[in-house]
Amino acid sequence: MENYSSNCYGFMHAGLLNSEDEFYLSRDEAFEWINGIKALDKKLNKIQWNTSDTIADCLSENNENKYNIIEIFDWDKKSQHVAFLDYDWNFYDQDGPDWPIRLWENIEDLLHEYKNMLWWTAYYQIHILNKDLSTKVENFLDEL
């Protein structure tokens, strides 16, 4: 799957389906069928490790599944990016077509990237996946 071409929402959608198909989707298209996922909704803290600690607390409280989703928003709460997030603080994503798939990178790197890009005004959500979806994501990522 080296040539996998998708945006971040399409990559997430493919993972939730455990599909080898490539998708280029809007945020609404990617999320429309997974209603009911619980979410933690917070503002990115200017002190990055405070955000990391909050995410770690959320993951430790919801550690029954290996994978969840982190979604990052701009000041207007418009979604900017999604990535899979495991309980070891690693994220897995694809930014856009022909961009490399990032696997097993530390969430601190993603937070730093978006904190700088969105000038300290971004929000984030943690979407907690159910066991079935988490397993599909695990199988999808194992095949990459």
How should each PLM-predicted stretch be described?
Residues 1-50:
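Cysteine-nucleophile protease catalytic domains, especially the papain-like/related folds used
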Residues 71-74, 82-107:
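Catalytic Cys-His active-site segments of thiol-dependent hydrolases/isopeptidases
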Residues 102-144:
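Noncatalytic regulatory segments and standalone regulatory/sensor domains
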Residues 21, 44, 75-78, 89, ...:
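Intrinsic-disorder/low-complexity loop/linker signature
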Residues 52-84:
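Active-site-adjacent substructure of cysteine-protease-like catalytic cores
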Residues 27-30, 40, 55, 107, ...:
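Short amphipathic alpha-helical segments that mediate assembly, nucleic-acid/protein binding
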Residues 15, 33, 43, 58, ...:
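Residues that form generic nucleotide/phosphate-binding pockets
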